[in-house]
């Protein structure tokens, strides 16, 4: 009785119940769920990276004998393992799905997701229902990863194996680029949706949909835990036309048009099969929820052998074509060669079978006998939706056109988040530069030297443009950058072009004033026939002039580092619709927040800082410095907490922390700061400004810069962070 009655409070915390609760299980977020989350600003710290300081993945990747790597992968694809046997003796279809699902989380709205960092290895992606049994695919690839180690990242391998699989089954791919460095923790800054239940349907609480099945931004997938759409139809409703709506919306949010969508669906489903052999209730927990003895594997299946012919993944069962490991036109042959009727799989999933289902058979996965072919509701959309059907029939009649479209769409799918072609590594990179890569011509000839830069800077300073104007335009050019998919930035000077020139956040009227002045300086300099300067460089150089002017106003003589080498894109090199997704709906650095923004302004500030690759101190010093300069959207005084706007000093920090001011909310989104003694209004500000006094972590950083001995440090740190933003997209300087 004595042993059994011992309580946790009196027991050993290691050997008894106290050890069953993870340390830190009750986090601050539990007690204060509305607390501003700053973790995205410290994600993937170098402290987590086992490769150590100085490791250069690009350099290691270039050492690979890619022909040998691909040969090893091809052999691996045909080396069936008893613990997870290959369907049809070839892992190719499984690896195509692996690559597709690694890349397919990408969405255009914020550039997040995708294959660029290898995060399919981590939660939540490794345990999404739609990624069922891909844990086995990664284990099958471990001998390849083990052999090539640091020279071949998981991120690159997950895409390369898809290409090799396609090629080994007879398809000619468009190309492959390496250069995706692994990260070492989940990307927790990605918002995957509001639901708290896997595969929650749109009629449940916390839905991701508004009126009329309007999917909330930035999401692209239709349900929590799916990569794209529900193969059975919207919310499991087997309606091909409703499915077509979902497919079109979701693929558009992943940067694909109708032709690319049909090519990907038909090309991908030329290979392999879906798995739904048994009762899904017999499938165990996902990897993150499985017992430790499973060693990171999940979805243990209690139906018969649980593998091979007895596998259950999506619940849909069967191959799409009679030749599931061969590139051919059989997908369209089957789709248009039969009339179809709705049925259910052994797992209870909606799917479609030919009315004459006995006449078109495929081999069983273990080679013993044959099984019927099938189509999903999503496949039926390729026939039932008028636009998709027209494209599908055109592809069916023109095999070479289909093959080229699939090759290009697959390449786009698997490389969309890598940024410009300058980041692509390896001998298999196609020479053709594509519009979706946001091409920027590299400047030719020698770049402006220090003396020429000084001459140009003097010309800018003599124009009468203010520091705030110069800084705002340079910030607008550079701050379009997204580290998520490496798009945007100052290189290319697309702030001169549509659509960026018309974005509200960029103050088009101010651009019309400032850009022609800078253009005339560049033209006069270039007209001498010697060294040339691009407008992309001119805008950044002029922004540096603005920072130096503001620093001098505060008594600091500084030099803002500048490295020339940016190119100028043309309007023809800019896909307006594709580039328009980069328009910020919120930029707290400029104190801009559109009424239709997704989240609260302070949250959007952190989100913007994360997309710019900034830390919390860098975000803090940039906001304080930009406010001191007066570089707010439209020159608004909200948040300009200084008596000397235009001077780069630490006044913002001193005043936002001052106990002499009492803040009150007005009827709008603006807060008033009144003198505690007199009651007179001293300042107006936004929530973004006041978060540096209200949030305990940001206040701690702000206190550093508000200190009496900190102004010089604040200016130096501002310049360093400024240059970082200006050079985020300089992949010729860093990767």
From Swiss-Prot:
PROSITE patterns: PEROXIDASE_1, PEROXIDASE_2, PEROXIDASE_4. GO terms for cellular component: cytosol. Heme b binds at residue 269. Pfam families: peroxidase. Residues 1-20 are annotated as: Disordered. Gene3D superfamilies: 1.10.520.10, Peroxidase, domain 2 (1.10.420.10). The active site is at residue 101. The keyword Heme applies. There is a cross-link at residues 228-254 (Tryptophyl-tyrosyl-methioninium (Tyr-Met) (with W-100)). This is Catalase-peroxidase. It comes from Jannaschia sp. (strain CCS1). The lineage of its organism: Bacteria, Pseudomonadati, Pseudomonadota, Alphaproteobacteria, Rhodobacterales.
């Amino acid at each position: 009785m004595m042993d059994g009655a011992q309580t946790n409070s009196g027991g050993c915390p290691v050997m008894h119940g106290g050890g069953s609760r993870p340390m830190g299980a009750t986090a601050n977020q539990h007690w204060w769920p509305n607390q501003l989350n700053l973790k995205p600003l410290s994600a993937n710290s170098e402290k987590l990276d086992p490769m150590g300081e100085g490791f250069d993945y690009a350099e290691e990747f270039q050492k690979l004998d890619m022909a040998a790597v691909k040969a090893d992968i091809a052999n691996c694809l045909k080396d069936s393992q008893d613990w997870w046997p290959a369907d049809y003796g070839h892992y190719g279809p499984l690896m195509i799905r692996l690559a597709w699902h690694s890349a397919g989380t990408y969405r255009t709205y914020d550039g997040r997701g995708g294959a660029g960092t290898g995060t399919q290895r981590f939660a939540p992606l490794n345990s999404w229902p739609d990624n069922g049994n891909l844990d086995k695919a990664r284990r099958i690839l471990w001998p390849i990863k083990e052999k090539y180690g640091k020279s071949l990242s998981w991120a690159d391998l997950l895409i390369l194996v898809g290409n090799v699989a396609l090629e080994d089954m007879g398809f000619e791919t468009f190309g492959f680029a390496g250069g995706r460095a692994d990260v070492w923790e989940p990307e927790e800054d990605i918002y995957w949706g509001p639901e708290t239940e896997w595969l929650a349907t749109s009629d449940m609480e916390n839905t991701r949909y508004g009126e009329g099945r309007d999917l909330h931004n930035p999401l692209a997938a239709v349900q929590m835990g799916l990569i794209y759409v529900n193969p059975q139809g919207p919310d499991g409703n087997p309606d091909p036309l409703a499915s077509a709506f979902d497919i079109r919306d979701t693929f558009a949010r992943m940067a694909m048009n109708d032709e690319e969508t049909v090519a990907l669906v038909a090309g991908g489903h030329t290979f392999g099969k879906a798995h739904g052999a048994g009762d899904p209730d017999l499938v165990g927990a996902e990897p993150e929820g499985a017992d430790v003895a499973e060693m990171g594997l999940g979805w243990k299946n209690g139906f018969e052998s649980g593998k091979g012919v007895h596998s259950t993944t999506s619940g849909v069962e069967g191959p799409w074509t009679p030749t599931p490991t061969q590139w051919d036109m059989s997908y369209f042959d089957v789709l248009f060669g039969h009339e179809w009727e709705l049925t259910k799989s052994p797992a209870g999933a909606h799917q479609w079978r030919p009315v004459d289902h006995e006449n078109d058979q495929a081999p069983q996965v273990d080679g013993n006998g044959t099984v019927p072919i099938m189509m999903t509701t999503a496949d039926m959309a390729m026939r039932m939706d008028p636009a998709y059907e027209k494209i599908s029939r055109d592809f069916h009649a023109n095999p070479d056109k289909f093959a080229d479209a699939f090759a290009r769409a697959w390449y786009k799918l698997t490389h969309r988040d890598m940024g410009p072609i300058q980041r692509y590594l390896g001998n298999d990179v196609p020479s053709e530069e594509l519009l979706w890569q946001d091409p920027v011509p590299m400047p030719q000839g020698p770049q402006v030297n220090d003396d020429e830069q000084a001459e140009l800077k003097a010309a800018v300073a003599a124009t009468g443009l203010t520091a705030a104007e110069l800084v705002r335009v340079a910030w607008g050019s550079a701050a379009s950058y997204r580290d998520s998919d490496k798009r945007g930035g100052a290189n290319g000077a697309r702030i001169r072009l549509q659509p960026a020139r018309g974005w509200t956040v960029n103050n088009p009227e101010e651009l019309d004033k400032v850009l022609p002045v800078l253009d005339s300086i560049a033209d006069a300099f270039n007209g001498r026939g010697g060294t040339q300067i691009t407008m992309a460089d001119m805008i950044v150089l002029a922004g540096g002039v603005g920072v130096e002017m503001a620093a001098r106003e505060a008594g600091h003589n500084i030099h803002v580092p500048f490295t020339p080498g940016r190119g100028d894109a043309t309007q023809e090199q800019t896909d307006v619709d594709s580039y328009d997704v980069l328009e910020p709906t919120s930029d707290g650095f400029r104190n801009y927040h559109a009424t239709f923004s997704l989240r609260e302004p302070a949250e959007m500030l952190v989100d913007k800082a994360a997309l710019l690759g900034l830390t919390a101190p860098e975000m803090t010093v940039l906001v304080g410095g930009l406010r001191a300069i007066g570089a707010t959207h439209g020159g608004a005084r909200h948040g300009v907490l200084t008596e000397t706007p235009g001077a780069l000093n630490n006044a913002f920090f001193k005043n936002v922390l001052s106990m002499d001011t009492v803040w009150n909310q007005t009827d709008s989104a603006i807060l008033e700061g009144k003198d505690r003694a007199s009651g007179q209004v001293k300042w107006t500000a936004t929530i973004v400004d006041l978060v540096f006094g209200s949030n305990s972590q940001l206040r701690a950083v702000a206190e550093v810069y508000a200190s009496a001995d900190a102004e010089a440090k604040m200016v130096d740190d501002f310049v360093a962070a400024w240059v970082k933003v200006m050079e985020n997209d300089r992949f010729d300087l860093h990767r």
